[in-house]
Amino acid sequence: MNRDARVETAISHWAPRLISNGVLLADFQEVTGQIQRWEDWCAAWCLRAADHEGLGRASLEDGYHLTAGEHLSRAALYYHFAKFMFVNDVAQMRAAHAKAIECKQLALPHLRPPGERVEIPYCGSYLAGYLRRPSGAARPPIMIMVPGLESAKEEMEAYELPFLSRGMATLLVDGPGQGEAEYEHPIRGDFEVPAAAIVDWVLTRTDVDTTRIGLWGVSMGGYLAPRAAAFEKRVTACIALAGPFDFQDIWDNLPELSRETFRVRSHCATQHEAKAYSAALTLKGELRDRSTVRFSF
């Protein structure tokens, strides 16, 4: 049986990402080695996620809290990668996503440093996030971290650790079209709007330094972060990791899985409509003249 081209694409394009973000190499090889059809991707990863979830829950019962946090975080990551581009079956995708959130919530108090779930008011609803503060810091600077097209806050632990180890707090947030927000709020090119809501919320905290707020984004988040920073004057530094300068310009070169994921998460009916919608995701124009922050690309 020939392997589904979508499975081949997922493996060839995203293997380094999965492994560098915390998927064990043995798990990656065993899980992907048995998947022939894309329709089986989500279920296969959920099965392996359940193994780590079981180990985490058993560790909690036995009082091994650090081990529990590690296993439950890994379970959340695997459930996330089960659903990350599985937009062809929304029911399966949402079920896996719910498990990712559940496992991460269980893990947060047992991480070092521990984390807390936060809900940031936005457009009559909220944006969900995870806040972690380095040990021993009264009011550390804070880095707001923005996921990409098919990523979410449950994937971001490997990215946040360098900031935590250097004395910075981290706030991982699902923006519109991402993670918990993707079902209610579509992707939006004017990310300065949700960014303003996030910064407004940060300013209510007394346990971080609100004069030193950074904004970090990866992949599509590497577009969203500098776009927002060009407008949001309360942000003092920005890191853009591999973001597109103009999303519509790269549309035709994206894998089919990515185009379909963008369609679903922008709440468009067709890919033709989604391509037109993607024109809003651009750094062209006068944005450079608006920015007062320090950038790192």
Language model region names:
Residues 145-158, 170:
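Serine-hydrolase catalytic-loop signature spanning alpha/beta hydrolases and amidase-signature enzymes
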